[in-house]
């Protein structure tokens, strides 16, 4: 329920200025196999309780009919529930960042780019941060807010916070010396065909589609079995990328957490880009879902893509204040969609406690107030 409420708040921020954020409010669909039916039903119940509009379809035949009503070539197997969220959607990343930049610059905020943070100056027993050291000089500060995506590990270490923690699980058992951070390799790519290839039967832009199923997945290239285990993909037509953009469930990075090289990030990394098996798996999964994608492997965009995400022990964000005046937004790879979190953090720093942020405090690990474990192959679902 906590993540549901936080996301509903962020969706309201996206909806507040769709043009500036390049936001497309087409909705979102969670299309799932039997293993996930109860979880998805619970999500629907929780959404209804907070007024977040969604439709829940149960049963294999009912789910197939619902999907065929949207896509007449729908052919995914093993689907027994569909959650169709009417709010939500996606945004064009670069344009959204440009829109955000304009908003803060118009408010008179100083934005300093291309600057490396080298350390912090602290004082007092609580190690309050009084200044930020950079390669261009020192910046004095009253409060420090860190929202740094996968680089949170490095700032966490700079501030002197523990790299391992004690954690009480949902059964009440205590686990010691658990890594605070773990990295997952993100699998993303683009099928270079006209985005209009993926429209609904009535010619409209569809919701963002997320499919999790345990039906066997066979190669669209040679018919060989790719997996008979639970697998998942998401996809959408994207005019920013010029094709069908999406990804598959990530996999864990086995490198010891403090040895993971975050830079260079994304496509420039020699170590952390989408795996060599990803393109065939993802395009085959698209073909598993829609007949229109059969034989589309030659259209896969072959340049490196993807990146890594930095996750907390329960894969949900940590948003809390440390050392008296250091607020950390550790997004646990939820970051981009959590547009409204900055607003909530700002309100807290001005003295107004935010109920929406309470379930995301660091203390939850020791207290055993963890977020639920997902049955999806996606750790952030």
Regions found by a protein language model. Give the residues of each.
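C-terminal catalytic lobe of FAD-dependent flavoproteins
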Residues: 252-263, 273-381
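Conserved N-terminal glycine-rich FAD pyrophosphate-binding loop of Rossmann-like flavoproteins
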Residues: 1-5, 20-30
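Flavin (FAD/FMN) cofactor-binding and adjacent substrate-gating region
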Residues: 15-16, 20, 24, 35-107, ...
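Mid-domain beta-loop-alpha active-site segment that forms a flexible
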Residues: 82-103, 148-151, 277, 281-285, ...
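A non-catalytic, amphipathic alpha-helix used as a structural packing/dimerization or gating element
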Residues: 2-16, 42, 46, 99, ...
């Amino acid at each position: 329920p906590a993540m549901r409420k936080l996301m509903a708040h962020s969706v309201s921020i996206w909806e507040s200025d769709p043009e500036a954020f390049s936001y497309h409010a087409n909705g979102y669909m969670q299309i799932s196999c039997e293993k996930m039916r109860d979880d998805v039903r619970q999500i629907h119940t929780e959404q209804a309780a907070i007024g977040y509009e969604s439709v829940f379809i149960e049963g294999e035949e009912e789910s197939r009919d619902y999907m065929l009503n949207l896509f007449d070539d729908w052919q995914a197997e093993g689907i027994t529930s569909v959650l169709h969220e009417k709010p939500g959607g996606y945004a064009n990343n670069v344009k959204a960042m440009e829109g955000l930049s304009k908003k803060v610059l118009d408010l008179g905020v100083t934005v300093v780019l291309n600057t490396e943070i080298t350390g912090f100056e602290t004082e007092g027993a609580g190690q309050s941060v009084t200044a930020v050291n950079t390669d261009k000089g020192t910046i004095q500060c009253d409060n420090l807010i860190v929202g740094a995506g996968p680089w949170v590990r490095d700032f966490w270490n700079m501030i002197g916070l523990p790299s391992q923690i004690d954690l009480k699980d949902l059964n009440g058992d205590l686990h010691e010396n658990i890594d605070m951070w773990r990295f997952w390799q993100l699998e993303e790519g683009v099928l270079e065909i006209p985005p209009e290839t993926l429209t609904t039967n009535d010619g409209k832009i569809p919701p963002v589609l997320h499919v999790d199923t345990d039906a066997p997945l066979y190669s669209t290239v040679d018919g060989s079995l790719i997996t008979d285990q639970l697998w998942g993909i998401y996809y959408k037509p994207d005019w920013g990328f010029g094709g069908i953009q999406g990804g598959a469930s990530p996999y864990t990075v086995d490198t010891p957490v403090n040895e993971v090289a975050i830079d260079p990030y994304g496509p420039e990394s020699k170590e952390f880009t989408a795996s060599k098996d990803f393109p065939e798996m993802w395009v085959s999964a698209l073909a598993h879902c829609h007949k229109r994608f059969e034989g589309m492997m030659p259209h896969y965009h072959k340049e490196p893509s993807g990146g890594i995400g930095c996750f907390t022990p329960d894969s949900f964000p940590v948003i809390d204040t440390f050392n008296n005046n250091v607020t950390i937004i550790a997004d646990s790879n939820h970051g981009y969609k959590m547009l409204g979190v900055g607003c909530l953090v700002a309100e807290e720093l001005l003295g107004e406690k935010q109920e929406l942020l309470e379930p995301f405090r660091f203390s939850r690990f020791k207290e055993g107030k963890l977020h639920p474990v997902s049955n999806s192959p996606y750790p952030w679902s």
